[in-house]
């Protein structure tokens, strides 16, 4: 975690941060084009829809993207890989966190078609003061892989509209002591407070970044991977 806001997380490979690590979703790079960072709050629903995750550590002749120093993380969402079925779940956590998820997978039909759909909504107050947030996730995928064929087609569309308040300042122990109601308060946040009886933050993150991908996989023979 960094900052304490929802989704303000990070991943390090071999000691290198995300600016030196390529993150791919169905082969599409999603690192920021200007600074190389990745904002996980934009891809919150990936944990619910991923059918596979591939990690290559360090420099190498990767076939997925330009090699990076830290490595490459490839996240796959294939409809034909999911078994038939559906589910509805409700999750409740500390600090007012709740998440509702509904999903359905058609499974692979005799003709080779498969469909997956997922919708979810979350909200929470955040562990740090004045870091509440709310968001919704959407995902749909259509796959086609007939029996005996060396070709597999997959179309995916996903996104995670969200907003959340952040804490992006370095807080000293003295600040924790001075502003805590009962001694040291690790939840104290100088970026926010109350305005007209409602939570207010000078650091409000809001985004919706839909991603559509189309993949055509051709397996020439069993010796090639």
Model-derived regions, located:
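Short acidic/polar hinge/loop motifs at secondary-structure boundaries
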Residues: 12, 29-57, 76
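Short beta-strands and strand-coil junctions in structured, solvent-facing domains, enriched
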Residues: 20, 30-31, 60-63, 126
């Amino acid at each position: 975690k960094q900052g304490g806001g929802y989704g303000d997380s990070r991943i390090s490979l071999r000691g290198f941060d995300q600016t030196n690590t390529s993150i791919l979703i169905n082969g599409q790079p999603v690192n920021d084009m200007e600074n190389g960072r990745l904002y996980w709050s934009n891809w919150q629903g990936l944990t619910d829809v991923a059918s596979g995750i591939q990690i290559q550590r360090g420099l190498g002749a990767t076939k997925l993207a330009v090699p990076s120093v830290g490595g490459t993380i490839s996240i796959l969402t294939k409809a034909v890989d999911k078994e038939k079925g559906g589910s509805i779940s409700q999750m409740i956590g500390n600090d007012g966190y709740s998440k509702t998820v509904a999903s359905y997978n058609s499974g692979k039909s005799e003709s080779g078609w498969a469909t997956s759909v997922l919708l979810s909504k979350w909200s929470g107050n955040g562990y740090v003061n004045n870091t509440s947030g709310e968001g919704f996730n959407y995902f749909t995928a259509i796959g086609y892989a007939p029996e005996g064929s060396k070709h597999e087609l997959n179309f995916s569309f996903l996104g995670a509209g969200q907003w959340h308040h952040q804490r992006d300042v370095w807080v000293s122990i003295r600040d924790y002591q001075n502003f805590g109601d009962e001694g040291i308060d690790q939840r104290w946040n100088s970026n926010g407070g109350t305005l007209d009886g409602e939570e207010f933050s000078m650091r409000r993150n809001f985004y919706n970044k839909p991603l559509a991908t189309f993949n055509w996989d051709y397996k020439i023979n069993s010796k090639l991977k």
